[in-house]
């Protein structure tokens, strides 16, 4: 069985004040010692990085984030700043970035809201309100529309049942309702899909997907693809994928961020930073299984310089 869990672990023999001095030295005077910055920050846990930031302020009298911002640039800066941000706040900042200014990064909104646990969603809501003085839901409403808006608002409520409880009658009813809302009739009753996919617990949904296949002879994903479209379709598919296998969902997000011409660096950075301590080993295993190549080799071929160095450390090894 492949190793599970994260690739970034808390460093043993950790000394925040020493790390703070190393970082200051790396940025003081002319030029920047990027390797020294990487050697400290890429090998510490998120919690340890917060301690380093505090030690930096108390022993040097400067803000580490401000110094990093002025010394670094481009994708390397973005990945380092992401690593320096507490987990929930990082999600909150990404959600805000996805909606700020012209255009919307729908993929980012879907990825975060479909993959985080109800508890994480609740913390995201609180932090968003504190950070920006308005609710996440209000921003979603002003930035999106129609069924896509409704599915995001529903996910952002964090109201999914977290139990394991299975009611066979309800499983059959949900599967039948989904069938009747889509495949069985002309036109689609989108609200039914939303209700079932956004509120039921994972165990229940996995049984609903099996029952749905039995009744309709189709995977629920196939039906979603043929019955819905656009960002609403993307959101429903993300929910189903996260329920079936969350690590495989992230492997696909990473694959799509790098395949073909150009790189979607925002997605690549966000997934690598936010999953490094949670399930990067599982993501790697799924990546290899789905695409026949290692995540490591993909990152190596698609990025360069210090940016590549950090991502490869977060990846944690070749498969």
From Swiss-Prot:
Cellular localization per UniProt: Zymogen granule membrane
Could you tell me which InterPro entries the record lists for this protein? Annexin, Annexin_repeat, Annexin_repeat_CS, Annexin_sf, ANX4
Q: Name one Pfam family in it.
A: Annexin
Q: Which PROSITE patterns match?
A: ANNEXIN_1 (PS00223), ANNEXIN_2 (PS51897)
Q: GO CC terms on record?
A: cytoplasm; nucleus; plasma membrane; vesicle membrane; zymogen granule membrane
Where in the sequence is N-acetylalanine found? 2
Record's keyword terms, sorted: Acetylation, Annexin, Calcium, Calcium/phospholipid-binding, Cytoplasmic vesicle, Membrane, Phosphoprotein, Repeat
Residues folding into a coiled coil are none
Annexin repeats located where?
A: 14-85, 86-157, 169-241, 245-316
Q: Name the Gene3D superfamilies for this protein.
A: Annexin
Q: Which cysteines are joined by disulfide bonds?
A: none
Provide the family line: Belongs to the annexin family.
Further notes on this entry? Seems to bind one calcium ion with high affinity.
Subunit comment for this entry? Monomer.
Give the function comment from the record: Calcium/phospholipid-binding protein which promotes membrane fusion and is involved in exocytosis.
| Name under which the protein is recorded | Annexin A4
This protein's species is Sus scrofa
Upper classification of the source organism reads: Eukaryota, Metazoa, Chordata, Craniata, Vertebrata
